[in-house]
């Protein structure tokens, strides 16, 4: 399993800082008293894309070398990662293709399209998602940015 180093995190911060908001960290005395612990809530829903996956997707996109940009990026996602990746790809000026189940919320689809992403719909099953995604990558040659298991994306700060 890949565990990002401190240097990986510093490099990630440099890649993404022009493209993300510095979001607040909130606390709650009430919840602290209920749990017996000091809790901190990082408000990533305040990101420019409006969703919490903006840092990882931005780091993945802005961490790609220039020779990998022509064909763009692709992923499969029902929502948050799709929005974040299409936002980051748009900022970098590269194509983004997202495989989404046809049952994904219309608001998420509209946001992906609004950021310049191209949606390829599939049936709402893992097998359909994987088969459709394989077709997209074969057709486009795009770089796969995994929705949760991307080595570059995980080093975000």
Show the residue positions of the predicted features.
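PLP-dependent amino-acid enzyme catalytic core
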Residues: 1-156
């Amino acid at each position: 399993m890949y565990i990002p180093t401190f240097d990986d995190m510093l490099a990630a911060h440099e890649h993404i800082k022009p493209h993300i908001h510095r979001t607040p960290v909130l606390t709650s005395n009430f919840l602290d008293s209920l749990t017996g612990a000091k809790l901190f809530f990082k408000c990533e829903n305040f990101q420019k894309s409006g969703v919490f996956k903006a840092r990882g997707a931005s780091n993945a996109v802005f961490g790609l070398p220039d020779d990998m940009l022509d064909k763009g990026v692709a992923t499969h996602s029902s929502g948050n990662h799709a929005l974040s990746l299409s936002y980051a790809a748009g900022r970098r000026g590269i194509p983004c293709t997202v495989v989404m189940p046809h049952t994904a919320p219309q608001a998420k689809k509209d946001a992906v399209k609004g950021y310049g992403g191209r949606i390829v719909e599939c049936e709402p099953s893992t097998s359909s998602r994987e088969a459709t995604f394989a077709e997209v990558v074969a057709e486009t040659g795009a770089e796969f940015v995994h929705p949760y298991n991307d080595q570059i994306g995980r080093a975000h700060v």
